[in-house]
């Protein structure tokens, strides 16, 4: 299950594998592993991805222990193949458009409906909120500055916004060394019209991805793999006079939904014009228009730089027993962000109707020049694992086994100094054994023993066992008559215990 946010450029998708299993939505997100390491999936260049595997039953996710309760999504990036260098280039252009936007009453319809409602409530003609001259001006559009009639959704929201994706890859190699390299560019424009003359107050997002994957056969039995990938990105957002609990984009749309069509005229000759309630109605005080939440408040620009690096050294141990091999793996992830905030205030104007019927614009408040503020964020984490794998066939009997130790530590800098951080650690021991007879009858036993620093001492470790049995019915002789339209049929039953450590960190200390 996937859902997207409202109109914000590059707003992260929300993905559920096993539905919402917690009161906290963020605690229901699946675990994403990119090349076996927990990393962000949503900012990968799709041209780097070889395949995606979704694990959701208890037997498949129990080995991930306290991280597997919400399912696991395994992402494998592309690797080079032996042969001449292959270069490919792809480009795509897309138009984003709102699927459906609400339609609003115009000023005349609004005023007539409001007055009629008051008449039904027993108001007299002289008690009605909208003056007759205002209603007539709404109908005839004789003075659109003093008596505005604005469709704010049409005025502020574009019909389309451009999105582009460009990518170039090169891959190949010899029998001993193989490589895959990729460069990608992603751009996304915002869906809002920009009326600010001095700076851009729309949304925009640019991302530049890079990747280099190497496979080196050191000997006939020893292989070294190295993956390096990352991205550089910048995101431009309008400065918003927001409300607690709402994102920028939600605040902007709330302003559009709540604004009346007669609350302002938008930008007139470079001036931001609100309506004067004294010309229209005694029942409406502050005539805030749909632009007040973001227009003239400045903008934010966030620059990000992320590096992902991992290596794997694998050794076949056939001299001990056929099918046995061992590997060690290490990974390092680093991210840095810099947010520059330029905040200010643009003055607004109100119409002043003169005795001769002409309209002048009167400035109501003062201008605040754009200020400057910076915020820096840093993050890094380490991951190591060591494992023994065994896989062997004995006639129609196929067995495999895995024993693995893994550990990770994540740093979250806090406070004004980037050197202040509170680490979060994870440690685990994994065991798995599988057996199948003639690729027909299956048995899978798993165990994860994990510890997480998100819990209090004495409560940090847990055992997560699981097992499954399966029967591939399509391999049976009695299924041959239906093989033409049912070539694969499998029955599987599994049971297991999984955990979730995505609670708020260190709540046991409060």
PLM feature segments, named:
Residues 77, 89, 168-174, 212-216, ...:
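Residues on the lipid-exposed face of transmembrane beta-strands in outer-membrane beta-barrel proteins
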Residues 98-100, 144-184, 188-192, 201-287, ...:
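Flexible loop and strand-edge segments within Gram-negative outer membrane beta-barrel domains
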Residues 87-95, 183-185, 226-232, 328-334, ...:
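Transmembrane beta-barrel strands of outer-membrane/channel proteins
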Residues 3-210, 224:
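Short, small/polar-rich motifs associated with maturation and membrane association
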Residues 104-110, 197-201, 241-253, 341-353, ...:
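Flexible, surface-exposed loop regions and adjacent strand-edge segments
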Residues 80-85, 175-176, 191, 221, ...:
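Short loop/turn motifs that connect adjacent beta-strands in outer-membrane beta-barrel proteins
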Residues 414, 480-509:
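Solvent-exposed loop/turn elements at secondary-structure boundaries
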Residues 148-171, 260-269, 344-444, 452-456, ...:
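Outer-membrane beta-barrel transmembrane domain signature of Gram-negative proteins
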